[in-house]
């Protein structure tokens, strides 16, 4: 018997197949389709420190995931407006996994020690994750509205205009509340026609509507499932927020952030913000 390790035809190798395309002089390649030349040349460290490349790539990839999450949430809002719950549920599942991916990215960044980070922190200037418009878009789409937070984007007219538009439109939860009303559950006008530029505040009529859904889950099963999937989104988002705060605390302690915030204490305040407050409150009353 011939030992397979001594036979290059059967050993630890894989030969090219004749059918595999190798000439892309006149065809679009993988790199062309993904614009990899631009993507992979978009890392410009401001120092000679090795670990700055890690810092840049983690944040760039996070921005891509945030862009995808924002795109999916736009689609989900449209699905909810149309009463298309089956597709909305599919999108929610995808957004949840995107948020899980973002949460895991903090584990990689946490390999950056305080000593490593201090070697290039000054090179960041005043740039900060607080200025991420991808993140701000998601916060606004989910209902955490605050007009003051788009001031940092006034230097970018296109971004500022997009965020202003999202600020003024109903959030995902606003659209869900409208669905409750359309399906015959009584909702106060103050919740249906509120100032959408303001952060959502819990409303007793909305709480009572959700209580009716949960107490009659078989009768309102789509709404019941929608509510639980919204809880999935908030749970995943809160885990991302917490992991962000903890990674920052691990690396810089209680120093001020590069963008001028109080740092960890500022991030901790976000943990008290709920996108869908009645969905948590109702559990107390069941």
UniProtKB/Swiss-Prot annotation:
Heme binds at residue 244. Coiled coil: none annotated. Substrate binds at residues 55-59, 117, 121, 258. It comes from the Bacteria. Its EC number is 1.13.11.11. GO terms for biological process: L-tryptophan catabolic process to acetyl-CoA; L-tryptophan catabolic process to kynurenine. Its cofactor is heme. Pfam families: Trp_dioxygenase. One of its GO terms (molecular function) is metal ion binding. Keywords: Dioxygenase, Heme, Iron, Metal-binding, Oxidoreductase, Tryptophan catabolism. The keyword Lyase does not apply. Binds 1 heme group per subunit. It catalyses: L-tryptophan + O2 = N-formyl-L-kynurenine. Pathway: Amino-acid degradation; L-tryptophan degradation via kynurenine pathway; L-kynurenine from L-tryptophan: step 1/2. Belongs to the tryptophan 2,3-dioxygenase family. Heme-dependent dioxygenase that catalyzes the oxidative cleavage of the L-tryptophan (L-Trp) pyrrole ring and converts L-tryptophan to N-formyl-L-kynurenine. Catalyzes the oxidative cleavage of the indole moiety. Homotetramer. This is Tryptophan 2,3-dioxygenase. The gene is kynA.
């Amino acid at each position: 018997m011939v030992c397979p390790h001594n036979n290059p035809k059967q050993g630890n190798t894989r030969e090219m197949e004749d059918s595999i395309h190798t000439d892309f002089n006149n065809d679009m390649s993988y790199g062309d389709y993904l614009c990899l030349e631009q993507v992979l040349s978009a890392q410009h460290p401001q120092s000679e420190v090795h670990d700055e490349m890690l810092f840049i790539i983690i944040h760039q990839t996070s921005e891509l995931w945030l862009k995808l999450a924002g795109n999916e949430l736009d689609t989900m809002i449209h699905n909810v407006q149309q009463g298309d719950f089956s597709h909305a549920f599919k999108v929610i599942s995808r957004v949840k996994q995107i948020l899980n991916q973002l949460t895991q990215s903090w584990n990689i960044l946490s390999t950056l020690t305080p000593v490593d980070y201090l070697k290039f922190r000054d090179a960041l200037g005043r740039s900060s994750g607080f200025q991420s418009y991808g993140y701000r878009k998601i916060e606004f789409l989910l209902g955490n509205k605050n007009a003051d937070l788009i001031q940092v984007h006034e230097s970018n007219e296109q971004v500022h205009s997009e965020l202003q538009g999202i600020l003024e439109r109903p959030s995902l939860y606003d659209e869900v509340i409208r669905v409750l009303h359309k399906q015959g559950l009584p909702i106060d006008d103050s919740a249906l026609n509120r100032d959408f530029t303001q952060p959502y505040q819990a409303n007793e009529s909305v709480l009572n509507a959700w209580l009716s859904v949960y107490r009659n889950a078989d009768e309102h099963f789509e709404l019941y499932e929608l509510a639980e999937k919204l809880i999935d989104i908030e749970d995943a988002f809160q885990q991302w927020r917490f992991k962000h705060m903890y990674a920052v605390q691990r690396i810089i302690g209680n120093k001020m952030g590069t963008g001028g915030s109080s740092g960890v204490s500022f991030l901790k305040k976000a943990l008290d913000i709920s996108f869908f407050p009645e969905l948590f409150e109702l559990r107390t009353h069941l």
